[in-house]
Amino acid sequence: MPIRLGINGFGRIGRMALRASLNIDGVQVVAINDPFTDCEYMEYMLKYDTVHGRFDGTIAHSEDSITVNGNKISVFKSMKPEEIPWGKTQVDIVLECTGRFTTKKDAELHITGGCKRVIISAPSADAPMFVCGCNLETYDPSTMKVISNASCTTNCLAPLAMVVNKKFGIKEGLMTTVHAVTATQLPVDGPSKKDWRGGRSCGANVIPSSTGAAKAVGKVLPALNGKLTGMAFRVPVPDVSVVDLTCTLEKDATYDEICAEIKRGSENELKGIMTYTNEDVVSSDFLSTTSTCNFDSKAGIMLNSRFVKLVAWYDNEFGYANKLVELAKYVGSKGCQ
């Protein structure tokens, strides 16, 4: 029996999670909750996508459901997580994709509606964070009802940092993510009390921004806790971002040795999560890529044997959503009683 998934919030990540689930064996989306979108519009938004292209499959809708590739998906319209009737469709795991309910207290309200586990598609202040390939072995099904899939940037940075740290040791590091625009940004200048620069036009500016992605690596990989921090630049591209990790190593190494170790990891324990390329790639070459850390050996540089800059690309929409569903599959495999 497949793991039965519910999606709360049919925005960018919610829709990408549904698309991703269709290519991952052992999972099935059976319910979606979005109080702001009717079924006809859901069909339209899933069918047409400016970034990832037209949906390659069949979609239909009724008053209270959409049918994707012959599979009927119930649609609910509740504003409050505790009122969503997940139990009606025997949902095992809810993917919390609204960006609103990111604490354990808020996210676990879904369990009141009848689901058994919740995975938050964003960083969380208090829920345990997991990154595929890095720390799934620490998941405890008996105590962890609500977990987080961390951020798209952490899903790129953590595998890269883990491989380098295991072999060469990371003494300290700074990360910069050059990040695609997201739905929270504004197309023209507007008010943004929390972040004045964030209120400037996303289509006409490179915008410096804060990010907790590097610090979050320390929660996923305790050996790196306190050793990494970072910032972001938001740039006018619709999807695909890139991480620049500049770090001081504990051991001497050549750039070729570091690249060789990353390549080894991409072909072994991180296969499907990390890839390695030595070609002259640009951001659009990684659109709809399912791996979340795509190392670019030609883009990195080294100053000396202990100071290096490493570069990795990631599809911050589809790649992240793919690992969100993969995490749900893993959680389901450990039991959802």
From Swiss-Prot:
Coiled-coil segments on the chain, per record: none
Keywords: Cytoplasm, Glycolysis, NAD, Oxidoreductase
A Pfam family matched in the record: Gp_dh_C
Disulfide-bonded cysteines: none
Cellular localisation: Cytoplasm
GO molecular function: glyceraldehyde-3-phosphate dehydrogenase (NAD+) (phosphorylating) activity; NAD binding; NADP binding
Family: Belongs to the glyceraldehyde-3-phosphate dehydrogenase family.
SUPFAM superfamilies on file: Glyceraldehyde-3-phosphate dehydrogenase-like, C-terminal domain, NAD(P)-binding Rossmann-fold domains
Active site: C152 (nucleophile)
GO CC aspect terms: cytosol
Record field: catalytic activity: D-glyceraldehyde 3-phosphate + phosphate + NAD(+) = (2R)-3-phospho-glyceroyl phosphate + NADH + H(+)
Residues the UniProt record annotates as site (Activates thiol group during catalysis): H179
Subunit structure: Homotetramer.
EC number(s) recorded for this UniProt protein: 1.2.1.12
Pathway per the UniProt entry: Carbohydrate degradation; glycolysis; pyruvate from D-glyceraldehyde 3-phosphate: step 1/5
Protein's name according to its UniProt entry: Glyceraldehyde-3-phosphate dehydrogenase 1
Originating gene: GAP1
Binding-site residues, D-glyceraldehyde 3-phosphate: S151, C152, T153, T182, T211, G212, R234
UniProt-annotated binding residues for NAD(+): R12, I13, D34, M79, N316
GO terms, biological process: glucose metabolic process; glycolytic process
